[in-house]
């Protein structure tokens, strides 16, 4: 048994430790690189291109825009719709997680509690699914994003890679497709409608809006008024 430990387990343990260290180093360097370089592609886009769902177009639409070319209303709308404590939390909204757990345990419709940081990590680096491995990697990358990027960069990347409809990636492509409007000129109502489709962009359309999107966008507008521009100032600081 001592010989087995010496010649098998110890070398195997060293290899595993080197692999873990290499993975950590690689992921840190990758996140640092994407802090200053806009990603030419991302995991969610690659999955859609390789395994297109029903209704996916032959060519996708995407155009990267910097934060200063995105309407403040659009930035506020996605915070109001998806993650109202975005500026305050460190990547994980434990209050929202508790509310979602209570809701789900009480027999309500299953509700998630992913923050914008977690959604950015998932769309940028990971595959779809609900396995514990993927959730663990999502948490790891979300932590790295919070440690190595600022909130402004996280929101910018999110708005440039999220899918607003079949093959419509990013807010610039979405604004032009649905409203014929660039991202920097989107109105509050247009922004609210775009944010309203994010739970399921294959089921809902920003224009023409379904009754659900109309109700959801009115709720988002109300939340935007309550949050005010102070939320964006906190993100940009």
Can you say where each PLM-predicted feature lies in the sequence?
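Juxtamembrane regions of bacterial inner-membrane/periplasmic proteins
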Residues: 2-237
